[in-house]
Amino acid sequence: MLTVNALIEWIGNEAQGESVIERILWLDEMSDLTYVIDVNANKLPYAKTISEYKVALDTEEAIMLDKDPFSRVVDEELLSEKAKAIRDRAWEAISSIVILEPEIYYPRERAKHVKTVAQKYGLSEKVIYKYLKRYWIRGKIVNALLPDYDRCGGRGKERNSKGIKRGRPRKHADIVGDGINVDEEIK
C-alpha cells in the first residue's frame, strides 16, 4: 500500500552505488500519478505512475523502507533560539506554497510561486528552492527545516595542525608576528 511520505528503495547494482531511494510526496489513485523526490540527490520532485511502483514492489525491483533515515525526535525545549528562528523563518517563507498540491509539483507553477514568495520575503529563489527540497526530502514536516547543528564540528576531538598556523593570517604579521597554534603545552 503506497502512502504519502513512504520511502521506496529501487534495488540496483549496489556495488556501483546505483540504489535510489525515493519519497512519495503526493498520490492520485484516479489518474495513476504520483510525485516523488530522490532523497539522496539535490533534485526537485518528478512524476511517476503508481502502477510502476506496484509492479516494482511485486517483482522486488523495489522495496518499501520501514525506517526513515531523516526522522528524528526533537525536543522543542532543547532547541536553541537561533535554531528555532531559522526553522520558523524558513517555514514562514514556504508554508503558503507547500499546501498547493499538486500544483507546486508542476515546474512552471512552482517557479511562479517561488518567485512570488522570494519577492515577498526578500529571499533569493535559490534559498526558497533549498527550503522546499529540504522540507520534501525530510518528510514534509516543519522540523525538517531545522539546521543540522548537531552534525557540525568535531566536539571533543583534538585538532591536528601539522605545524601550520590555523585561521586567517594576521594583517600586520610583520609587526605583531605570525601567531601560534594552541597545543597541550600552551594550554
Residue spans of the language-model regions?
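Secondary-structure boundary/capping micro-motif
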Residues: M1-K187
